[in-house]
Regions:
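Residue(s) in the substrate-gating loop at a strand-loop-helix junction
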Residues: 26
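Short, small/polar-rich loop/turn modules that mediate ligand/substrate recognition or access, typified
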Residues: 58, 63, 119-122
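Active-site loop immediately N-terminal to the catalytic Tyr-X3-Lys motif
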Residues: 31-37, 59, 97
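Short C-terminal tail/terminal secondary-structure segment
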Residues: 31, 121-136
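Active-site helix of classical SDR
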Residues: 42, 50
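Alpha-helical segment proximal to the catalytic Tyr-Lys
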Residues: 5, 55-56
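A glycine/serine/threonine-rich, flexible loop-to-helix segment
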Residues: 59, 71-94, 134-136
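A conserved structural motif in NAD(P)-dependent oxidoreductases
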Residues: 94-105
Length: 136
């Protein structure tokens, strides 16, 4: 809250442009994973926090965004790498049929932070290779 109050109090410079708060959550904010309920609940809580911040801060000129990474190749996914390699190769869970990388998430965050979506707030950007698509 202290950081938000400061962001509101200090007007943006011409160079920095619009200010943004970016929450990094996970597709687990909406996708159930029965073996990781605590993780899913925490991400879903952050997702609602982002939505509430967006609603509350819009009039203050602060845009709030949420990035939901999908299956990203990191140390956190190392234990399930073989399983996900197989599922990704089959094309059943990731339509783009590849792992996501931290750089994919970083590029999304950079676009939001640079004000590329200045007339958007509360935007949820899934960086998931299409995992959000409903398919038969």
């Amino acid at each position: 809250q202290k950081a938000v109050r400061r962001m509101i109090a200090v007007p943006p410079s011409r160079r920095s442009g619009r200010r943004a708060i970016i929450f990094i959550t996970s597709i687990s904010a909406e996708v159930s994973s029965v073996n990781r309920p605590e993780y899913c609940l925490s991400k879903s809580g952050l997702s609602m926090t982002a939505r509430l911040f967006a609603d509350r801060l819009a009039a203050s000129g602060l845009n709030v965004y949420e990035i939901r990474p999908g299956i990203i190749r990191t140390d956190m996914t190392a234990a399930v790498r073989e399983r996900y390699d197989r599922l990704i190769a089959e094309g059943t869970i990731v339509p783009q049929a590849r792992w996501g990388f931290p750089e994919d998430v970083g590029k999304a965050a950079a676009a939001l932070a640079l004000g590329r979506f200045a007339y958007s707030t509360g935007l949820v950007l899934e960086v998931s290779g299409g995992m959000n698509l409903r398919r038969l």
